[in-house]
């Protein structure tokens, strides 16, 4: 037996005034069929009442307790773009953002700029005092930052104000150590250098001419050091792969030892080649026991407050599932369909609202759920579970779970 965990990033939502969500209103005949043929429930990827990051959520779905393994988003983001994060390195996730001359954020994602490779070159390889700056774009407005040098600490604050109209935050140490103080000073110096180098860069001058938001600032967050983490194959006995479009998910996969399968045209946006990813899933199952799949577009639509786009992305995902389920055997593959977190249209951010989940495959205890959405699956036989329960359930069904006790 093989297994797939298929994550529709940002899937869940809250009902609008008519009681609808993008998922409830979308035409999803395949998701609904899987709900009828599988066992359903609700899932909080991290815990009840906890707003998950995509990082902590995916760790949990892979069977890792995020409360003991998570050290910050930065190391995963850096790993995802090919940077080897060494012990002692300090890593961050960054956004390219638009700011005014007072560092007031006018667009947190720089108009969702598509290509920042030329801007990356302005910062990668810099040296501030005795610290090397490693800076890599991670797709669109996303980037990874690594500080490498002696005497650094991750005990510092983030720069992200999290809202437009607010000033980029000055970095402060979180303890009295000289290492934390030094690291905060280095990052603050870097932010000033970044603005000086990026604001008048030809890429941004051209964007101004086109009346587009400029990418004239980097905003670091999610600071952390490389975690100690058991490899997935050692933990589960499965040979695993990952198919995802974003650096963060690729980084998590690489760090736990999953092989990352790159698919041309799949960049994590609503315009990705969804069917290319579907084909890749079917092909990859021929050589692997397990695949983690992340489809990102619905999350971007949720962050932008775009109800119609989120619904359209979900319908594209349903078309993917149509192809996949027609080309795999239910008797050979267990398939988990859910999200990593809700990204409600009204919030335009992650929320703790639970997600619909269905487990589809042979010998599951089929319940009477007939539709896959936030309101129907709560009646299902899985009841209300956490993300860390998914892998143990799969391993048990696959005959790989170890007995607890005599």
Swiss-Prot record:
The first-level EC class reads isomerase
Keywords for this entry?
A: Glycolysis, Isomerase
What Pfam families does the database record attribute to this sequence? Metalloenzyme, PhosphMutase
Recorded metabolic or biological pathway in which this protein acts: Carbohydrate degradation; glycolysis; pyruvate from D-glyceraldehyde 3-phosphate: step 3/5
List its EC numbers: 5.4.2.12
Signal sequence extent? none
Superkingdom of origin: Archaea
Instruction: Cite a single GO MF annotation.
Output: phosphoglycerate mutase activity
The reactions it catalyses are: (2R)-2-phosphoglycerate = (2R)-3-phosphoglycerate
Q: Which GO terms describe its biological process?
A: glycolytic process
Q: What does this protein do?
A: Catalyzes the interconversion of 2-phosphoglycerate and 3-phosphoglycerate.
Q: Which family does it belong to?
A: Belongs to the BPG-independent phosphoglycerate mutase family. A-PGAM subfamily.
Q: Which HAMAP family match?
A: ApgM_A
Q: What is this protein called?
A: 2,3-bisphosphoglycerate-independent phosphoglycerate mutase
């Amino acid at each position: 037996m093989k297994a797939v965990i298929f994550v529709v990033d940002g899937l869940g939502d809250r009902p609008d005034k008519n009681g609808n969500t993008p998922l409830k209103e979308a035409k999803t005949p395949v998701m609904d069929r899987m709900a009828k043929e599988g066992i359903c429930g609700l899932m909080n990827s991290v815990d009840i009442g906890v707003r998950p990051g995509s990082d902590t959520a995916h760790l949990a779905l892979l069977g890792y307790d995020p409360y003991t393994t998570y050290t910050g988003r930065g190391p995963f983001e850096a790993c995802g773009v090919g940077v080897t994060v060494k012990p002692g390195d300090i890593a961050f996730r960054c956004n390219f953002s638009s700011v005014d001359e007072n560092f007031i954020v006018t667009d947190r994602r720089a108009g969702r700029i598509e290509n920042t490779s030329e801007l990356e070159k302005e910062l990668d390889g810099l040296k501030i005092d005795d610290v090397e700056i490693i800076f890599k774009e991670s797709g669109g407005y996303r980037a990874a930052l690594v500080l490498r040098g002696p005497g650094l600490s991750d005990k510092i604050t983030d720069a992200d104000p999290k809202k437009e109209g607010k000033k980029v935050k000055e970095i402060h140490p979180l303890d009295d150590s000289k290492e934390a103080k030094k690291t905060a000073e280095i990052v603050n110096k870097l932010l000033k250098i970044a603005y000086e180098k990026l604001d008048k860069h030809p890429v941004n001058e051209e964007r101004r001419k086109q009346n587009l938001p400029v990418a004239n600032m980097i905003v670091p967050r999610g600071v952390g050091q490389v975690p100690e983490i058991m490899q997935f194959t050692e933990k589960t006995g499965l040979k695993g792969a990952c198919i995802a479009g974003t650096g963060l998910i690729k980084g998590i996969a690489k760090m736990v030892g999953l092989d990352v399968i790159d698919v041309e045209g799949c960049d994590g946006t609503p315009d990705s080649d969804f069917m290319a990813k579907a084909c890749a899933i079917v092909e990859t199952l021929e050589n692997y026991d397990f695949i983690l799949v992340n489809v990102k577009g619905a999350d971007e639509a949720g962050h932008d407050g775009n109800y119609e786009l989120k619904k359209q992305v979900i319908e594209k995902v349903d078309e993917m599932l149509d192809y996949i389920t027609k080309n795999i055997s239910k008797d050979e593959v267990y398939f988990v369909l859910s999200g990593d977190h809700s990204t409600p249209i009204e919030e335009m951010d992650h929320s703790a609202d639970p997600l619909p989940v269905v487990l589809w495959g042979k010998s599951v205890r089929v319940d009477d759920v007939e539709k896959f959405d936030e309101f129907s699956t709560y009646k299902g036989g899985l009841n209300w579970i956490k993300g860390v329960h998914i892998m143990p359930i799969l391993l048990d069904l696959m005959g790989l779970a170890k007995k607890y006790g005599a």
